[in-house]
C-alpha cells in the first residue's frame, strides 16, 4: 500500500483542476458531473450557474463524493495508454454567493469574469469540505507499481 501523508495528497489536489463530483438527486438517483475546481485552505471551490441541476441536487442533499483524476503518461512515449491516478473522498457541499468569497479566491475561480457583475449575479459557488479519508490509486507510486493494485492503493486522513 502506498504510504502518503495528508500534506502530500493535498499538494496533488492543489496541483490539479479537474474532478468528477458525485451526488444524489432529490429522487435518490445517482448523478455525476465533471467539474473544474480551485483548492484552498482544505476545501474545494467550484463555480456553477445558480439554476444548474447540480446546484438543485446539492441543495437537497449536501453529501457528495469527489474523484480527482491525475493524468499519467510514459515519458517520451505518449502513445502508450496509462490509466489516470485518482484521489477519491466524501465531503459536505455548501452553496455560497461569489460576493461571500475572499476577492483573491473569487478572481482565481472566475478569472476574466471576476469583475463581471452580471456573470457573478447568475453564479453560485459550490464549496466542498472533505471528510474522513482520502482513498488514492496511483498517487506517489511509479507507473510500474501502478500495475500492482496493492502497491498502488493508499489512504490518508483528510485532516492531519
Residue ranges and their predicted role:
Residues 50-51, 131:
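A generic "binding-loop/recognition-motif" signal
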Residues 61-73, 83-94:
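Active-site-adjacent structural patch at catalytic or cofactor/ligand-binding sites
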Residues 4, 78-160:
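Charged, gly/pro-rich active-site loop segments
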Residues 1-19:
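Short, basic/aromatic recognition patches
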Residues 19, 44, 64, 93-94, ...:
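Short beta-strand segments in beta-sandwich/barrel cores
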Residues 17-50, 56-58, 65-69, 77-79:
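Short beta-strand segments
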Residues 51-53, 121-122:
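A short beta-loop-beta micro-motif enriched in histidine and acidic residues
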Residues 15, 29-31, 85, 122:
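Residue-level preference for beta-strand/loop junctions
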Amino acid at each position: 500500500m502506498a504510504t502518503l501523508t495528508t500534506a502530500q495528497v493535498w499538494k496533488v489536489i492543489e496541483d490539479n483542476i479537474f474532478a468528477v463530483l458525485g451526488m444524489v438527486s432529490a429522487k435518490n438517483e445517482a448523478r455525476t458531473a465533471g467539474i473544474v475546481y480551485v483548492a484552498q485552505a482544505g476545501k474545494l471551490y467550484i463555480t456553477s450557474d445558480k439554476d444548474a441541476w447540480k446546484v438543485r441536487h446539492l441543495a437537497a442533499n449536501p453529501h457528495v463524493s469527489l474523484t480527482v483524476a491525475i493524468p499519467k503518461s510514459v515519458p517520451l512515449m505518449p502513445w502508450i495508454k496509462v490509466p489516470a491516478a485518482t484521489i477519491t473522498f466524501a465531503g459536505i457541499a455548501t452553496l455560497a454567493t461569489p460576493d461571500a468569497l475572499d476577492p483573491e479566491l473569487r478572481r482565481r475561480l472566475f478569472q476574466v469574469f471576476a469583475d463581471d457583475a452580471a456573470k457573478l449575479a447568475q453564479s453560485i459557488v459550490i464549496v466542498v469540505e472533505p471528510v474522513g479519508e482520502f482513498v488514492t490509486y496511483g498517487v506517489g507510486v511509479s507507473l510500474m507499481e501502478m500495475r500492482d493494485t496493492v502497491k498502488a492503493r493508499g489512504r490518508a486522513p483528510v485532516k492531519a
